[in-house]
Amino acid sequence: MKKSLLIACLCFLGMVAYAQKETKVSIETEYGKIVMLLYNNTPQHRDNMIKLAKSHFYDSTLFHRVIPNFVIQGGDPQSKHAQPGAMLGNGEIGYRIPAEINTEDCHIRGAVGMARDGNPKKESSGCQFYIVTGKPATDAELDNVERTRGAKYTAAQREIYKTQGGTPHLDGGYTVFGQVIEGMDVVDKISAQACDQNNRPTKDIAMIKVRLVKKKKKFLGIF
């Protein structure tokens, strides 16, 4: 009896600990809300996003780079008060994040990654991120990426790339630190907007509000 109770308690504590680790961030736009789940195996990127969301850093920044069947990108602090048609994408926060590139985190449709410049360490921007829209990939394309990055895709990863799509050529080059779990229809609406020659939407698309999603309390009991 005591042993069974101990096991039950340990299982309960494990479930509580697991629930506490799940972090979600919401982005409100005029087209609707996007909810991202942040990965725990990229802790520095996760914690950076948490910090910026808590400080309201992203509020009023724009999705300044939109390329259909590729990505939508935002987070440039210079975009908050940018003039129409101004080139964006060079604004920064003053630091980089060490690369946390994992073979299990791929650029499938809905993946959230951090932008970066051409630095050899593949360190990420401290603030600019992107969401993958992508397109379906072929086995030949995936084979080519495997040879380039020196890592094999799992059968599940291949299936997702071939059916749902993504941007596999980015794998191994950028840190993927999350996944959109709600609002890909919103991402698609943003991706469909008209853009200028610099891939900036001709009509500003702002992140009205970026916040941590409050965890709902769950109660266990006998009913």
PLM features per residue range, with description:
Residues 1-4:
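Positively charged n-region of N-terminal signal peptides that target proteins for export
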Residues 7-8, 69:
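Hydrophobic positions within alpha-helical membrane elements
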Residues 9-18:
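Hydrophobic h-region of N-terminal signal peptides that target proteins for export
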Residues 17-223:
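Cyclophilin-like peptidyl-prolyl cis-trans isomerases
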Residues 8-9, 79:
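A periodicity- and composition-biased signal for non-globular, repetitive helical segments
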